[in-house]
Curated annotation (Swiss-Prot):
Compartments it resides in: Cytoplasm
GO molecular function, one term: tRNA binding
A Pfam entry, by short name: Anticodon_2
Motif ('HIGH' region) on chain: 12-22
The entry's keywords: Aminoacyl-tRNA synthetase, ATP-binding, Cytoplasm, Ligase, Nucleotide-binding, Protein biosynthesis
Motif 'KMSKS' region boundaries: 244-248
UniProt xrefs under Gene3D superfamilies: 1.10.10.350, Glutamate-tRNA synthetase, class I, anticodon-binding domain 1, HUPs
Protein's name according to its UniProt entry: Glutamate--tRNA ligase
Enzyme class: ligase
Purpose of the protein: Catalyzes the attachment of glutamate to tRNA(Glu) in a two-step reaction: glutamate is first activated by ATP to form Glu-AMP and then transferred to the acceptor end of tRNA(Glu).
Reactions it catalyzes: tRNA(Glu) + L-glutamate + ATP = L-glutamyl-tRNA(Glu) + AMP + diphosphate
């Protein structure tokens, strides 16, 4: 058996918006290429000049870079290959694989209306298709023709889809496809074929909204002497309401998830499971995913977006992240809240303290605010309502115990234990007033850990203000 060098591609149209379903269409071909030590190519299908902008392309590249989907080639822009498409159109005209069609838009619309009135499926009737012995209509003056591919008549297009199994489409269902518009610009399905052939794409892994394009592309490719790639059409990604995921249906963009404090590895893990599985594995690294990925494990049923599952996964990744790396990822969110991470407690320690309870980087940054706020200026009323007079003697003894304790979690825990026993108190009766004295709130992580991060001197200074 000959060795096949795997080459896959992600070929989006740049619309300026990329959601999770779009990115999944990039992730799977990337993973397949990486698993097989092949090549992954980014191709920008920008022949729709009205919708395509460089800013829109940048959004795609930014999302892929954030997820770590590295490229071997690209981005390759279709509009930069226009001369190549024109060259192939001319070859097809010269060889009889294509022909000019002078049918106007009005004539096509009239034909479509007549067919629908007769309960027929709308289709091009082959008026300008050259056949032996057929007399073509006179060429109208001043009309620029479209160029149509001369599709096979009779028979079927059959391919074995890596996800959907064998698919067969009758050629009678397929029109003579327009491959170049009257202004000379090539059409989507034609460009795709030439690109896939020129770039030697071996596997086309894409959404199942492209299934209807596949027989047309196969016929053009075979007519040009090419070998069709392996096709794998991924089932649709549905939103949490069961509708197809789209901007129109309220899908969040990848940028939105970035801004909401999701980690790229959590998003990648989540996307991997939207239509693919490896046993019962729920949480896995990018490296494990690449090692396990194969087309045989792709699901056939639509995958439904589950925001709660994504948030849970993000929590798992935050919880298991290296504190140094997590602190770096959190800094932009902290700075946006006005936190100066360079002054005050060690930010890595603060993040390490907060990460086990946080679902997003924003939640970590919100929690970190406590440690960088000025010393609370508590009123007498606040002190009376939150720090009972009966606890003041215990707080005084706690200050002494903290002063002589080892500055560790264990040391401070021992100091609390000593004072609790001395005053016959339960932990909440002492810990809650301490929290309030330190932060003007009773909602904090474990108090012994808080003291380590805050530092002994700052903690004693704040406690002393309420026990004078």
């Amino acid at each position: 058996m000959l060795f096949m060098h795997i080459r896959t591609r992600f070929a989006p149209s740049p619309t300026g918006f990329i959601h999770l379903g779009n990115l999944r269409s990039a992730l799977y071909p990337w993973a397949f290429a990486r698993h097989n030590k092949g090549d992954f190519i980014l191709r920008i299908e920008d022949t729709d000049l009205e919708r395509s902008t460089q800013e829109a392309v940048d959004v795609i590249i930014e999302g892929m870079t954030w997820l770590g989907l590295d490229l071997d080639e690209g981005p390759i822009y279709q509009m930069q290959r226009i001369d190549r498409y024109h060259e192939v159109v001319k070859q097809m005209l010269d060889s009889g694989l294509a022909y000019p069609c002078y049918m106007s838009e009005e004539e096509l619309n009239l034909l479509r209306d007549q067919q629908m009135a007769n309960k027929e499926k709308p289709h091009y009737n082959g008026l300008w298709r050259p056949e032996p012995g057929k007399m073509l209509p006179p060429i109208p003056e001043g009309v620029k023709p479209v160029i149509r591919f001369k599709n096979s008549i009779g028979g079927s297009v059959i391919w074995n889809d890596a996800v959907k199994g064998q698919i067969e489409i009758s050629n009678d269902e397929l029109d003579d496809l327009v491959i170049a518009r009257s202004d000379g610009t090539p059409t989507y399905n034609f460009c795709v074929v030439i690109d896939d052939m020129d770039m030697q794409i071996t596997h086309v892994i894409r959404g199942d909204d492209h299934v209807n394009n596949t027989p047309r592309q196969i016929n053009i490719m075979k007519a040009l002497g090419g070998t069709p790639p392996v096709y794998a059409h991924l089932p649709t990604v549905l939103n949490d309401s069961g509708e197809k995921m789209s901007k129109r249906n309220g899908a969040m963009s990848v940028r939105d998830y970035q801004k909401a404090g999701y980690l790229p590895d959590a998003i990648l893990n989540y996307l991997a499971r939207l239509g693919w599985s490896h046993g019962d594995a729920e949480v896995f690294s990018k490296e494990q995913f690449v090692a396990w990925f194969d087309l045989e494990s792709l699901g056939r049923s639509p995958a439904q977006h589950n925001p709660e599952k994504l948030l849970w996964l993000n929590h798992q990744y935050i919880q298991n992240s290296d504190p140094d790396k997590l602190a770096e990822a959190t800094k932009p969110f902290a700075h946006a809240l006005g936190i100066d991470t360079e002054s005050g407690p060690n930010f890595v320690q603060v993040v390490g303290l907060l990460k086990d309870r946080a679902n997003t980087l924003i939640e970590i940054a919100e929690g970190a605010k406590l440690f960088y706020m000025p010393t609370p200026n508590l009123s007498d009323k606040q002190v009376r309502e939150n720090i009972p007079e009966t606890v003041i003697p215990a707080l005084k003894d706690l200050v002494g115990a903290i002063s002589s304790a080892e500055p560790t979690k264990e040391g401070y825990a021992a100091a609390f234990k000593q004072v609790l026993a001395q005053h016959q108190l339960k932990m909440p009766a002492l810990a809650m007033p301490v929290r309030y004295a330190l932060f003007a709130t009773t909602q904090t992580p474990a108090i012994d850990s808080v003291l380590v991060v805050m530092g002994r001197d700052e903690a004693i200074k704040r406690l002393s203000k309420v026990i004078r």
